[in-house]
């Protein structure tokens, strides 16, 4: 049995890989969700308010509208839709120039979800036939292209051209999770998957925690909102170059790694792909009828619906209900994500330690994690629904931090379950799960269109209550059917398991050669003496 090589080590190659995946996930998430805060800067709220008043009143009398920029966080603000005299409608305007109503905004937000819905299922075939590393790189290139041309499309061709471009971005998004899941599945043993996934998905929170203040600052500067798109594209291009020269889909293909780590991964993760495995059919019927898989599948739907709602619409809530200015909006959007990051990583490391020490089984670990996320989030949403308005925005921030901290354990719950049920079918199961997740994301704008007409506090209260009930429902289902164990239908036959053992051959110069069979051809990976690096 190979001795464990620590994950958190300067020469840990799998740590380097998951950090690269995390930064890449930050880039794709930021290019997708920064539009939420940027939209509040792009849109002329005053013009929209006037337009709505004319439609409602049937005339052009717009004297009933009061424009404000923000409220003083240290004092009672103007709550609801009426100002102090009870007559004028209060509108917070960030000085945008585009007149896009709520329907047009929701259509734009839904574009990426429509695109990803098209590609997420076919992604598994691409990943099985091509390197996940290259597939991910092409996907990010599509993100970059759409991001940098968006300002031109918005100002010259209108909202529908932006919607079409966002569909193009979504075509790339459909590959992001399946490719990263495949790479992480190749690099990490089951005892480290919760930690690895916690690190990888940090990119999501960093995109909001670091990205939101940056977007707010750029929007408020002379550069204006178009610069946010250009900055996002430039940063993603830098990551893409780094990824091309340093990343690998599989440990056996790495040219630079310590001998100790490679032996550890060969013994605990790396599996040879034999001819008998190449022709083995994927058990779709067993996958789609597995209670454990279906349990995490519905979680994927609801969690993505919730996350999309808060990623896209939280800046609107801060603007419409709490009446925050653009800088305060960016700050309030960022802070809960910082709590999420810290709690997620600490929880992921802690839960893996409990599994490693046999205190918790894999199944108990994912159920405890998911239970904390679901019921903790539900409780926080009830507090937000009944105890927060623009007179106490700081209280609202505290409740959001509580909710985001709770949601940090989702990764150690249903997401870890997905990668544990049948590791050899990770690409297929990830694609199916992401297809359902994309339906959840696509559902979000439709749900918001139904419940959010004018952006009133009452409308947001109903949204929070509905999300709270959905959290309870989804969490209860996972507690009944969820699992973190390898499923019986996914176990490899004994004779194949014996063939999984790697054959090491020592040659006279001290170099150790590992014979590794790839999906397409025979390949060899070279290792050097202990405590040295391969170049």
Swiss-Prot record:
PROSITE patterns: MFS
UniProt keyword Membrane, yes or no: yes
GO molecular function list: symporter activity; transmembrane transporter activity
Membrane topology recorded in Swiss-Prot or TrEMBL: Multi-pass membrane protein
Transmembrane segments: 17-37, 107-127, 144-164, 167-187, 199-219, 225-245, 292-312, 331-351, 368-388, 395-415, 429-451, 463-483
SUPFAM superfamilies: MFS general substrate transporter
Glycosylated residues, chain numbering: 44, 61, 329
GO BP annotations listed: sodium ion transport
Keyword annotations: Glycoprotein, Ion transport, Membrane, Sodium, Sodium transport, Symport, Transmembrane, Transmembrane helix, Transport
UniProt-listed InterPro entries: MFS (IPR011701), MFS_dom (IPR020846), MFS_Na/Anion_cotransporter (IPR050382), MFS_trans_sf (IPR036259)
Localization of this protein: Membrane
Tagged with keyword Transport: yes
Cellular component per GO, a single term: membrane
Main location class: membrane
Disulphide linkage map: none
Family under the similarity heading: Belongs to the major facilitator superfamily. Sodium/anion cotransporter family.
Protein name from the UniProt record: Uncharacterized transporter slc-17.3
